[in-house]
């Protein structure tokens, strides 16, 4: 098989197999071809991975942050040297076009290793607090063994976004990728060992729904970081609460993108397309509710339709391809069912709406789809679809659109396009979301915090803020004189 790894798991610095685990088939979404066959972790594999992490972590934590950071920066360099190889693997794993993966996937992971490697010492600083004759100081200390649970839309990026801050803070990690995309994280683990990471600090185990609870409920696990759906997040939070584990979650969204009548229409359309069709719409922060001022609606839809229908759908390994398949047959069927709901509930189909006829019948393709005249109560406007389906809604005034944008259980992201920056700042101040863009969309450099509010999760990925979620504050009071006691 064209992408078969040496074994299913990577534990304590080497590949490990246990064929007693449930078979996981890795399928290339463009053709339906099985490209690798792996096995889910058995309870014994889970124990082996956590034991390796627990054993390796204390010595790693005793190293200076600068020394830890140096290893991560080496890993970043190796990832960049192998960007083509890693990008092709990511395309096989996910079906995303190579023109995307080569600029956005391993590259983003390398950025994460480089950023956290570079700020290792400064980012973990404590504080000095004078108290008259006495004083106190604080320091950030690692949590111990951390578990990362990844999603299937950006497998290599997520493996790095969780691994980099965890490692630089002095922790060890056991990472479980999605069973839909099991391959990329294994390569990240290999590269970390090559860069000099001591064995046992970054372990990758495959798994299904049975594996997650084994990791989350393990008494030696101190923290769980999940990227996934809201229903999965609720289950993980409930399980972790039993042992009061640290938890961060980056979950789903149904984010608003607001286009005012003074916006640059072409730029706003570009933002809306990036926020709906990039990675075939499989991005948690997508602005899938596009609110367009009624005054410019007709022109907006005219230009949007032309640009959407001009997108090239095809072989993900062809560098000209702009739209690849969905990650799986099940995801394609889910998206197609939402498209049918949109039609049935009275939305106007502007573009797309089905399976393209220019691609392999075995691939999991869906046309980039635009609905107009969408109302707030329609299913496609309220539920996360996680596919290339854009909903365009009309609005008339600022107060109205803010209220409607906030009328959702989600709070991951949002965006505003307008030439009036005063209005832009006023609006984003009132939007209930964790990550917002003005005259841009879906840009997430590692230097800035990324995360949501409401049902879209808590905690932040990236930036200095991420280190707070992989460490805890220790306070030390120092008495400088004799103790005065009343007895």
Curated annotation (Swiss-Prot):
Gene3D superfamilies documented for this protein: Aldehyde Dehydrogenase, Chain A, domain 1 (3.40.605.10), Aldehyde Dehydrogenase, Chain A, domain 2 (3.40.309.10)
Assembly description: Dimer of dimers.
InterPro entries (UniProt xref): Ald_DH/histidinol_DH, Ald_DH_C, Ald_DH_CS_CYS, Ald_DH_CS_GLU, Ald_DH_N, Aldehyde_DH_dom, BADH
Residues reported in the UniProt entry to bind NAD(+): 150-152, 176-179, 229-232, 252, 284, 384
Annotated metabolic or biological route of this protein: Amine and polyamine biosynthesis; betaine biosynthesis via choline pathway; betaine from betaine aldehyde: step 1/1
Task performed by this protein: Involved in the biosynthesis of the osmoprotectant glycine betaine. Catalyzes the irreversible oxidation of betaine aldehyde to the corresponding acid.
Gene that specifies this protein: betB
GO molecular function (one): betaine-aldehyde dehydrogenase (NAD+) activity
Co-factor: note: Binds 2 potassium ions per subunit.
Cofactor field: K(+)
Transmembrane spans: none
Family: Belongs to the aldehyde dehydrogenase family.
Swiss-Prot/TrEMBL GO biological process terms: glycine betaine biosynthetic process from choline
Residues that hold K(+) 1 according to the record: 26-27, 93
Modified residues (Cysteine sulfenic acid (-SOH)): 284
Keyword annotations of the record: Metal-binding, NAD, NADP, Oxidation, Oxidoreductase, Potassium
Pfam family name, one: Aldedh
Superkingdom of the source species: Bacteria
EC nos: 1.2.1.8
Protein name, as recorded: Betaine aldehyde dehydrogenase
Residues at the active site: 162, 250, 284, 461
Reactions mediated catalytically: betaine aldehyde + NAD(+) + H2O = glycine betaine + NADH + 2 H(+)
Residues that, per the record, bind K(+) 2: 244, 454, 457
Keyword Oxidoreductase assigned: yes
């Amino acid at each position: 098989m064209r992408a078969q790894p040496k074994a299913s798991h990577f534990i304590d610095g080497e590949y490990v197999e246990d064929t007693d685990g449930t078979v996981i088939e890795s399928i290339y979404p463009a053709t339906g071809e099985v490209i690798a066959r792996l096995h889910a972790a058995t309870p014994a594999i889970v124990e082996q991975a956590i034991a390796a992490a627990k054993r390796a972590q204390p010595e790693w934590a005793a190293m200076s942050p600068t020394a830890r950071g140096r290893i991560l920066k080496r890993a970043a360099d190796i990832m960049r040297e192998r960007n083509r190889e890693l990008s092709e693997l990511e395309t096989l794993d996910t079906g995303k076009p190579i023109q995307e993966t080569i600029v956005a996937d391993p590259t983003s992971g390398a950025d994460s290793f480089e950023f956290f490697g570079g700020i290792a010492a400064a980012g973990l600083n404590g504080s000095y607090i004078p108290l008259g004759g006495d004083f106190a100081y604080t320091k950030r200390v690692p949590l111990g063994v951390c578990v990362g649970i990844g999603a299937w839309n950006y497998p290599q990026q997520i493996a790095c976004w969780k691994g980099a801050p965890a490692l630089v803070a002095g922790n060890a990690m056991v990472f479980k990728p999605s069973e839909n995309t099991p391959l990329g994280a294994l390569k990240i683990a290999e590269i970390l060992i090559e860069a000099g990471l001591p064995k046992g600090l970054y372990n990758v185990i495959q798994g299904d729904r049975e594996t997650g609870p084994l990791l989350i409920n393990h008494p030696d696990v101190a923290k769980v970081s999940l990227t996934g759906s809201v229903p999965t997040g609720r289950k993980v939070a409930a399980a972790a609460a039993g042992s009061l584990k640290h938890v961060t979650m980056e979950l789903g969204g149904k984010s608003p993108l607001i286009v005012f009548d003074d916006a640059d229409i072409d730029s706003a359309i570009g933002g809306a397309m990036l926020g709906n069709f990039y990675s075939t719409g499989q991005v948690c922060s997508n602005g899938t509710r596009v609110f367009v001022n009624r005054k410019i609606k007709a022109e907006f839809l005219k230009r949007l339709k032309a640009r959407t229908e001009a997108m090239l759908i095809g072989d993900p390994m062809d560098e000209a391809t702009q739209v690849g398949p969905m990650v799986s047959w099940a995801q394609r069927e889910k998206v197609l069912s939402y498209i049918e709901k949109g039609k049935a509930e009275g939305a106007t189909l502007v573009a797309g709406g089905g399976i393209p006829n220019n691609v392999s019948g075995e691939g999991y393709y869906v046309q980039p789809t635009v609905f107009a005249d969408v109302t707030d109560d329609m299913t496609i406007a309220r539920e996360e679809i996680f596919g290339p389906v854009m909903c365009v809604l009309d609005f008339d005034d600022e107060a109205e659109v803010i209220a409607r944008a906030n009328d959702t259980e989600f709070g991951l992201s949002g965006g505003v396009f307008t030439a009036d920056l005063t209005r832009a700042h006023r609006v984003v101040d009132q939007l209930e979301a964790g990550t917002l863009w003005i005259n841009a969309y879906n840009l997430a450099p590692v230097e800035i915090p990324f995360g949501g509010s409401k049902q879209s999760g808590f905690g932040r990925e990236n930036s200095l803020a991420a280190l707070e979620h992989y460490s805890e504050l220790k306070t030390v009071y120092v008495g400088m004189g004799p103790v005065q006691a009343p007895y």
